């Protein structure tokens, strides 16, 4: 009876993506417990037990991945700021070796870090909200995983873009800067890749619990309550407020010459990102 139950549990664990050392550990602990009690019926149906393990492992793993992703991206953000701060005067945008690739790399260097920063913070916000939960709905975990994936992907794109930018515009950049850019990009991509591997491993586990995913307003409710704009439940009002704030910062930083152009660009980019990724990242329902 016990051996048959263990075979059923092994199959059910595999069905929800629990394999390898995790499955062997669960089966060993289950076998010890059943041999002590001898009561298979009271232990629970194998499918329900497997689903419970999947929910708990996916929740804890996704939460760890969220923090790991942020820790991988934080030094990347510092390195990005230092690298760009070292450029006194940027090269002529039309001086790239392969102009379409050069312009694409320049746009990536501008946009990808902003996406990585925003989604990284959103990932941590969701993980922090779920910090005391043992198991959460599959939809919640899906949002957490997608945010981490976009944050890591954007971070990797940013430093790939920097490396390409350094190559494409090497004629207009100091040689020491291009060398530094290549070295820093390679170093930064290592922890990002490590976090991505951890995310991929966690994504193999398929949680079974049903329930709503929640949205941005659930993640940052305490902060929104401090803002007198009645933002809760009004995602586009929140989006426009953020877009205006980002555009204002770009206007001030760019000065009278480039400020207006940069402000319009940032405003459109924020709104487009919210429209395109809002539901995917759980920012709005």
PLM feature segments, named:
Residues 1-71:
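Negatively charged linear elements and acidic catalytic determinants
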Residues 60-285:
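Hydrophobic alpha-helical bundles in membrane proteins
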């Amino acid at each position: 009876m016990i051996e048959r139950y263990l075979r059923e549990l092994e199959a059910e664990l595999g069905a929800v993506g629990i394999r390898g050392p995790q499955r062997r550990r669960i089966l060993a602990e289950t076998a010890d417990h059943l041999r002590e009690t001898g009561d298979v019926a009271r232990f629970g149906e194998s499918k329900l037990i497997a689903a419970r393990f999947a929910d708990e492992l996916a929740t804890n793993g996704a939460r760890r991945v969220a923090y790991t992703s942020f820790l991988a991206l934080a030094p990347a953000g510092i390195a990005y700021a230092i690298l760009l701060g070292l450029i006194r005067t940027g090269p002529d945008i039309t001086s790239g070796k392969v102009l379409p690739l050069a312009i694409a790399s320049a746009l990536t260097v501008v946009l990808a870090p902003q996406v990585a920063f925003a989604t990284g913070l959103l990932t941590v916000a969701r993980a922090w909200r779920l910090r005391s939960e043992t198991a959460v709905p599959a939809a919640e975990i899906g949002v957490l995983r997608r945010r981490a994936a976009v944050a890591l992907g954007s971070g990797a794109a940013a430093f790939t873009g920097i490396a390409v930018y350094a190559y494409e515009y090497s004629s207009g950049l100091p040689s020491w800067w291009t060398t530094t850019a290549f070295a820093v990009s390679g170093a930064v991509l290592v922890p990002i890749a490590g976090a991505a591997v951890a995310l991929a491993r966690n994504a193999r586990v398929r949680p079974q619990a049903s329930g709503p995913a929640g949205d941005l307003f659930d993640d940052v409710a305490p902060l929104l309550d401090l803002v007198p704009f009645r933002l809760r439940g009004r995602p586009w009002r929140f989006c426009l407020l953020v877009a205006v704030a980002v555009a204002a910062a770009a206007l001030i930083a760019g000065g009278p010459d480039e400020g207006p152009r940069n402000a319009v660009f940032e405003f459109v980019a924020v709104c487009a990102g919210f429209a395109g990724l809002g539901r995917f990242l759980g920012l709005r329902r």
